[in-house]
Structure formats: structure tokens, C-alpha cells
């Protein structure tokens, strides 16, 4: 409730400085074991019992004026006794939040004198952001009532009678009282004033055969109109009230039986256990999991090979390349070999651990290395393409044989040319047989025959050409396919001319035969 913290108040939430009004705040009330009942005996100045005092602090719930239930601290105290053989008593009921701020409080005091009984009541309620104090005094048949309203801000640091009970128990646990601290309080007339707390040291009390050390705290309510009201509290270390003395009164309240002193629970640190080496092979559970996982992976591998028969071929190809190239770094070679088969190809190497980047290497060096790797890969692909092209060229080359002549040609040439060449050679052989006899021709006819019609000359030329072709190197044929095609076409043109000449010779032969028949 305050902003200033001084000295030991910080320990348990009381805040004040010398001459200042303190405020209350304590977040760990439940940790101090403050919830317990206690009973004290009221004794006269002669030591005779006159009654008893009961105090209890417990957890409770409070319903505000709009019907909302909240958790709170419930303080209840009551006393019954005799004063000059007249019955007297008091009661207190208060609701506090965890910051010891008052939510509602009701108090009552009475003395039943034979002639003029007296009764005094006072209630403090929090309504609409302000505190309403209602006080009534009844003497005989006459009753006086007064109502006072205080803004909520003016009650900052207010210590009610209920809060005083809890605050004393907190002081007992801490064995300390703030020096020079002031709090707000209400006097017996219901007017706002201030109160102070002061430590009176320690004292030993003996109850029966037991002794205990008590911490003494004095509270003084400084009324502006009346004399100060002081009360001394003798507190046991666990917060129990062992004795209460009102200054100026002959009587007192004291315990008759020593309570069981409770000590604050000491939280022990959790035990530390040395880490033992884990031998999974000797652990039945872990070894069982290992066998199950091993069998699962084996079945998964077998299932994958059944559904992907091409995997065996890929492995075989890899082993073949491995034996042929014999790389120094087998792991990197395997990564580069199987990289094209990856489902998601990334620009980084498949095995990043083989190329761990140095923390001191710049990104430019890394990019240069990646570019260099890509260039080497492209060169390897080009070499493989060239080798594959040479193999395909050898397979596509065809050899055509006609007698002693060999004609090399590619598949790109027109198939109609092949048919034409074969038909031509076939017809030519038949015609040569019919013209071998030179006597069948007249001299004029022979003279009219062109030099190109001489079959012997043609055959010699062809033989020479074929011999030249046979002597050419196979590499020249492969490299000069266009030249060979031109030569073949030239031969075809010559043969076409010779064919036309042969047609003329055939017609002449027909005429000669007819003349011979007529002469016969």
C-alpha cells in the first residue's frame, strides 16, 4: 500500500519511514503458519481468573456488496469475564485480504452494571470506493449513533483491530519491529488517528515445567482528544500470544498451558544422485526396444526393396562406377552419385558434415566453392555425353556389301536411294550378259557407242574407285560422311547416263537381229 521501504519492514511487508505513515503488504502469509486458534485466561491483579480470551485466524470467503465471492483472512476474537462482579465482554469479526487491507469489520463491547448497563458497537464497511464508519453507544435506555465517511485514499496504511492480530503474529515470526513507523487507526470514539509499534525486547516465561522465550511488542494508539491507549503483547516465536497487558489496568491475559511451539519448515535441497553409465545391452527393457526397432527397420527395408526393384540396379551401377573410378573419398563420391535421385534436390551438398563451413570463412568463399563444384559436375556430364555419343555412332553405322564393293552410309540417308541402287545393280548384271558378244554389233553401231558404254572401262573405273574406298580409313569415313554421300551421288549420275546409252544399244541390237533374220 506504500511506495517507501525502510529497513526490516521489507522482510515481511511493512513499509514506513520515520514520521511517515506505513503501509502493509505481505505476499507470503500462508507460509508463516499464521492460521491457528489460541485461548488465554483473564486474571485479576490478585491472580484470580476472571474469564478467558479466544483468538482465531482462518481462511474464509467474503461476499462484497455486488455479490462477488473472494478469498480472505477471517479474524475472530471474543472475551468473557467479570469486572467488579459485573459481567463484561467483547467480540471482533473482521475480513482482510492478503495485503491486510480491511474489507469489513464489526466490534462490540459491553458491561452490564446493575444500575446503568453500557454497550458500544462500531462497524467499518467498504462501499463505493470509500469507508463508512458507523458507531453506536447505548447507556441504559439511551442510544447515540454516528456515521463517518472516509475516502479510500485516506485509509492508506490503515491498521484495523483485525489486521493488528495478524500483524503481531508476523512480528513474532520475524522477531523484529520497525523503528519509528506509524500507521493509521481508529480510536475508541471512531475517529481517525495514528498508532505506533515498539519493541520492548525479550523475556522468558515459565508455564508449568516449561520455559519459552517471548518477544515483547507494544502498540500505542494516539488519540487526538483522549489519552494514549497502550497495550503490551508477549509473543512466542511461532506467533502464539503468551500474555497481554493493558497499560493502566490491573488485570491481564495469560496462557495457562504451553502450546506446542511450531517451527518453520526447512525446505531441504533435493538429493543429488550421481549419473550412472547406461549399459543398454544389459537393460532388458532397452534391449527389447532395440530388438523391436531393429526388426522394424529390417522389415521396412525389405518392403521398400519389394516396392522399388530399381533400387538394386542403382546400387549395382554405383558399385560398378566405384570399382572403375576408385575415388579417394568414397562418401563424397556416393553423395554425388545419388544426388540426382533425391526427392528434393538442394543446392547444398547432400552430406553437409563433409563440408562444415568455418565460422571465419566468408560467404563469398563458400559461393565460389559451390560454383566450382557445379563446373566440375558439368564437365563430367559433358564427358559422359561424348562417350555415349561415340557408342551410339558406332551402333548406328551400317555396312552395305555388293560383291567386292562396300558402301558406308548412315541411317539419315533416304531409304529410296538404297532401293534404287540395288535395282540398278541387279538390272545391270543381266544386261551385261546379253552384250558380252561383240560380234552382234555392226561396226557402225560400235563406233556410235560412247566411251562411257564400255562396260570394261566402267568396271575398271568402279574397281579403282572401290579399291580407293576400301583403302580409306574408317575414321575418315566417319568424319567425312558428307563427302562420301557426294561421291555416291556422282556415281549414280554416271550410271544414269550409261543406262540411257544402254537403251540405245538395245534398240540397235533389235534392228541387227531383224536384218539377220531377213538374210537367212
Curated annotation (Swiss-Prot):
Function text: Plays a role in primary ciliogenesis by modulating actin polymerization.
Signal peptide: none
Primary subcellular site in the record, as a coarse category: nucleus
Biased composition (Acidic residues): 365-409, 428-485
Name under which the protein is recorded: Ciliogenesis-associated TTC17-interacting protein
Segments for region (Disordered): 352-409, 423-520
Biased composition (Low complexity): 504-520
Complexes and interactors: Interacts with TTC17.
Family according to the record: Belongs to the CATIP family.
Gene Ontology BP, a term: cilium organization
InterPro entries assigned: CATIP_N
Cellular component, GO annotation: actin cytoskeleton; cytoplasm; nucleus; plasma membrane
Cell membrane is among the record's keywords: yes
Subcellular location: Nucleus; Cytoplasm; Cell membrane; Cytoplasm, Cytoskeleton
Record organism: Mus musculus (Mouse)
Taxonomic lineage from the root: Eukaryota, Metazoa, Chordata, Craniata, Vertebrata
Amino acid at each position: 500500500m506504500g511506495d517507501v521501504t525502510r529497513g526490516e519492514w521489507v522482510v515481511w511487508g511493512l513499509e514506513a519511514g520515520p514520521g511517515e505513515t506505513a503501509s502493509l503488504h505481505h505476499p507470503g502469509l500462508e507460509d508463516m503458519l499464521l492460521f491457528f486458534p489460541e485461548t488465554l485466561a483473564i486474571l485479576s491483579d490478585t491472580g484470580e481468573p476472571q474469564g478467558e480470551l479466544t483468538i482465531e485466524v482462518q481462511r474464509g470467503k467474503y461476499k462484497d456488496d455486488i455479490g462477488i465471492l473472494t478469498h480472505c483472512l477471517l479474524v475472530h476474537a471474543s472475551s468473557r469475564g467479570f469486572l467488579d462482579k459485573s459481567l463484561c465482554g467483547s467480540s471482533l469479526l473482521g475480513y482482510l485480504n492478503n495485503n491486510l487491507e480491511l474489507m469489513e469489520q464489526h466490534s462490540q463491547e459491553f458491561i452490564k452494571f446493575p444500575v446503568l448497563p453500557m454497550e458500544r458497537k462500531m462497524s467499518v464497511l467498504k462501499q463505493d470506493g470509500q469507508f463508512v464508519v458507523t458507531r453506536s453507544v447505548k447507556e441504559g435506555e439511551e442510544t447515540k449513533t454516528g456515521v463517518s465517511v472516509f475516502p479510500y485514499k485516506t485509509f492508506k496504511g490503515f491498521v484495523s483491530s483485525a489486521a493488528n492480530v495478524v500483524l503481531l503474529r508476523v512480528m513474532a515470526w520475524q522477531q523484529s519491529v520497525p523503528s519509528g513507523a506509524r500507521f493509521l487507526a481508529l480510536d475508541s470514539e471512531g475517529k481517525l488517528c495514528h498508532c505506533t509499534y515498539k519493541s520492548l525486547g525479550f523475556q522468558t516465561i515459565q508455564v508449568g515445567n516449561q520455559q519459552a522465550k517471548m518477544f515483547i511488542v507494544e502498540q500505542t494508539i494516539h488519540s487526538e482528544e483522549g489519552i494514549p491507549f497502550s497495550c503490551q503483547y508477549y509473543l512466542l516465536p511461532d506467533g502464539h500470544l503468551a500474555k497481554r497487558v493493558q497499560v493502566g489496568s490491573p488485570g491481564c491475559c495469560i496462557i495457562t498451558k504451553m502450546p506446542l511451539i511450531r517451527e518453520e519448515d526447512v525446505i531441504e535441497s533435493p538429493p543429488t544422485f550421481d549419473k550412472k553409465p547406461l549399459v543398454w545391452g544389459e537393460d532388458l527393457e532397452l534391449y527389447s526396444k532395440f530388438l523391436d526397432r531393429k526388426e522394424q527397420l529390417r522389415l521396412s527395408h525389405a518392403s521398400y526393396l519389394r516396392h522399388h526393384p530399381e533400387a538394386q540396379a542403382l546400387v549395382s551401377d554405383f558399385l560398378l562406377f566405384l570399382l572403375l573410378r576408385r575415388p579417394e573419398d568414397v562418401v563424397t563420391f556416393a553423395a554425388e552419385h545419388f544426388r540426382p535421385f533425391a526427392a528434393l534436390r538442394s543446392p547444398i551438398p547432400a552430406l553437409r558434415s563433409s563440408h562444415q563451413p568455418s565460422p571465419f570463412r566468408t560467404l563469398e568463399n563458400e559461393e565460389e566453392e559451390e560454383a566450382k563444384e557445379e563446373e566440375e559436375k558439368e564437365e563430367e556430364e559433358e564427358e559422359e555425353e561424348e562417350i555415349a555419343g561415340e557408342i551410339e555412332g558406332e551402333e548406328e553405322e551400317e555396312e552395305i556389301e555388293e560383291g567386292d564393293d562396300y558402301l558406308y552410309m548412315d541411317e539419315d540417308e533416304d531409304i529410296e536411294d538404297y532401293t534404287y541402287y540395288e535395282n540398278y545393280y541387279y538390272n545391270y548384271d543381266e544386261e551385261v550378259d546379253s552384250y558380252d558378244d561383240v560380234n552382234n554389233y555392226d561396226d557402225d553401231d560400235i563406233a556410235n557407242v560412247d566411251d562411257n558404254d564400255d562396260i570394261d572401262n566402267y568396271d575398271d573405273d568402279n574397281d579403282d574407285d572401290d579399291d580407293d574406298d576400301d583403302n580409306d580409313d574408317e575414321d575418315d569415313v566417319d568424319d567425312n560422311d558428307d563427302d562420301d554421300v557426294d561421291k555416291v551421288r556422282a556415281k549414280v549420275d554416271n550410271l544414269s547416263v550409261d543406262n540411257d546409252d544402254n537403251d540405245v544399244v538395245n534398240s540397235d541390237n533389235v534392228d541387227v537381229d531383224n536384218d539377220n533374220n531377213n538374210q537367212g
